[in-house]
Amino acid sequence: MGNNKEITNVSKATIGRMPAYLRYLKEKEGAGEKTISSTAIAEDQRLNAVQVRKDLAVISSVAGKPKLGFEIRELIRDINRFLGYDNVTEAVLVGAGGLGSALAGYGGFKNYGLNIVAAFDKSPERIGRTINGVKIFDAKDLTHTVRRLNVLIGIIAVPGPAAQEVADELVAGGVRAIWNFAPAHLALPPDIAVKNEDMAASLAI
């Protein structure tokens, strides 16, 4: 997830806003726009323009130009570099049911620099099978396998009541960041980055 030294000096709130900025900027780039103002970004994200400028100052050395704003291509490049999206990072997926299967086949993860290398489930019917090229392992081996693979990112797609236990096992295996699609609040050490996904938005996947 980018340069560790760089990220440790940035608040989790700022890091958490970067993927949304990136999605919006890519939409604008796709529409043919070349520049954008912090005010436009703020309005789309329902934030204060001052906050947006502070966030962008963290990851970009390029200042916005009066009346022109920021160059979209440069901001996209800087955010990709900051988050490590310009490098592929391996991740594991826990939960191979309906949502998990959809996530395993979601090509958009590559836009975030993520490559799912293994999936886990407790259902005997699913263990040993593959979903979209990703092999499903027994969930009881989660911690051991994550440690063996040296994976730092975990994606949780299990029912809410099981999410905390899964998160604890991921952390025990060495995971440093969790993308949580389960409808549950996770209590984790302060040095573990957590992104709680809005399920309404997730259904769009």
Q: Over which residues does each language-model region extend?
A:
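Phosphate-bearing ligand-interacting subdomains
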Residues: 26-29, 134-205
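N-terminal Rossmann-fold NAD(P) dinucleotide-binding loop
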Residues: 100
